Amino acid sequence: MNKFIITSESVTEGHPDKVCDLISDSILDEYLKQDSNSRVAVENMISNNLLVIAGEVTSSAKVDVEKVALNTIKEIGYSTNESGFDVGKAIIITNINEQSKDIAMGVNREKICAGDQGLVYGYATNESKSYLPLAAELSHALAKRLSKVRKECIVEGLYPDGKSQVSLVYENGIPSYVKSVVLAAHHKESKDIATLRYELIKEVIMKVIDSSLIRKNTSIHINATGKFAIGGPMADVGLTGRKIIVDTYGGFGRHGGGAYSGKDPSKADRSASYMSRYVAKNLVAADLCDKCEVQLAYVIGKENPESIYIDTFGTEKYDLEKIYDVTKKVFDLSIDGIIKNLRLQRPIYKKTAAYGHFGRNEDEFTWEKTDKKYEIKNLIG
């Protein structure tokens, strides 16, 4: 029997890096609400009560980025030093400039072209309903549930910062059981750790992970140091784009290296990543293969991909040449086509910033639809 263990992690929206992703995407959405052709690349850094926002923007929109940032931080749940960030004492530095004209002349044409060179990957597997690796799906579900029990006071004494991790045992390539679960939950100084562990097992872990995946030897680690009373930006510096594996496939497949948050869809890092996932997911949903990874590469100022690579990890049920042919016929992989077909010039990005850009079923996540599977099936023959 071929047996191995794979681990994935996720974080709550209160994790310092995710706070920054949320701020970046909230700012992006505000620009897109007023001007759908906005060119935006905004990043930020948060530490203690300091927030630095920087980037390049070309837009007719007028956005109060400081106001957007503070509102986002409040929505997450930060308010005081003890919670991790005191919005009343925040120091905000901004440095936002216009997009380089050298870049703009390659992007702003009759048809939108790539705003930079780069390679991206999309991945899909049929091992879960979301077509995500199961460990990644479970990690996101745990982090989302951890946030829910805090916001709804199902578990008292929690603050926004938190993390989850799932180690999953595979047998002959199929998920078998959970080896371990890790939760980190930022809490009030007065919170009893034994009570917290009991509550999180009952209200988070047992609500998310099916009992069929739990074994007697499954280990659970909650705030493993014994205390997590100092958290959020008060404990750790946060930075936009530092959770790219959490954002994607939890360590399965490959990553082109480019982060998503704060970038408008003319940036191939974002739009082409969404398209590569869309392609991979539809190929798996059409039952052409059990697993699929799609690489797309682009050149700045060019409309169409420089290269397309499809890896089915030996699970293909049709000749790979046929799969390539069908992919090219069904999907418009030009940057302009991606933006139009996935309707990416809308203010939809704040929702993507936490709990993964993939495996979601909200209407905004057009790249998660499997609406091309029937066309693929008809063409494959």
Which stretches of residues belong to each language-model region?
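Glycine-rich anion/phosphate-binding loop at the beta-strand->alpha-helix junction
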Residues: 191-283
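Alpha-helical support elements that line or immediately flank enzyme active sites
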Residues: 13-32, 128-144, 263-287
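N-terminal, positively charged regions that mediate nucleic acid binding
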Residues: 1-41, 46, 380
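Internal helix-turn-beta structural module
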Residues: 47-48, 289-291, 299-381
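Short, charge-patterned binding micro-sites
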Residues: 41-59, 300-304
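Glycine-rich, mobile lid/loop segments that gate access to catalytic sites or pores
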Residues: 7, 67, 74-230, 354, ...
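A short glycine-rich, hydrophobically flanked beta-strand micro-motif that places a catalytic Asp/Glu
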Residues: 38-42, 162-168, 218-222, 288-299
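Conserved phosphate/anionic-ligand binding catalytic regions in large, soluble enzymes, centered on
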Residues: 9-11, 15-20, 112-127, 229-253, ...
